[in-house]
């Protein structure tokens, strides 16, 4: 939440909006994820209810309440922002895609999904899911984010792609070794037969050498006796 608040303030500083929009955006940033305390499903709507209740208790105007609610609902992932305010809160909410700590944040999300039995991704599956997210599902909307955050997002994407490529190369190498091992041990009876013949021949030669040695000894003994 603090990250979203800071990102919202950064975007506000570089955008042309009025005081009411600024106040509503900051409040929306603080309240946008509080609905998780009520559950994961449709948490944005739960966040709106909590924010509305708080603002009403503190005598906020209906105009401000409506604007805060509108901005909170704009953080819903499937929502396409319709104005500058929604663009700001949307970009702020996804600013972690452009942060140096993106990988750590992503891993925490994977663990959270596992903890709540929502989805269990392997490391490789999670990397691919993140690559898909950054290439197909996410985009920044404000001019400031496009100019200042998009490059960092692309660098994070590149790191993910490189990591996945290394994993695939390692798996392919291990798979190749396993295939060769299986080929020569199990899938090549001809080689096994050849090995058997070689061992048999070697044993036969050893036995012949032993027999020849014994024969030479007997001949020597007989020669001594005769003499």
Segment roles from a protein language model:
Residues 27-28, 88, 207:
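Residue-level marker of motif borders
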Residues 21-39, 43, 47, 68-76:
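His-Asp-centered metal-binding catalytic motifs of divalent-metal-dependent phosphohydrolases/nucleases
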Residues 4, 8, 43-58:
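An active-site-proximal "capping" alpha-helix that borders the catalytic cofactor pocket
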Residues 182-202:
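Short, charged/polar, low-complexity loop and linker segments
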Residues 84, 193, 200, 207-210:
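Juxtamembrane loop-transmembrane helix junctions in multi-pass integral membrane proteins
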Residues 2, 6-19, 31, 60, ...:
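Divalent metal-dependent phosphate-bond-processing catalytic cores, especially two-metal-ion Mg2+/Mn2+ enzymes
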Residues 206-227:
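Alpha-helical transmembrane segments and their immediate juxtamembrane boundary regions
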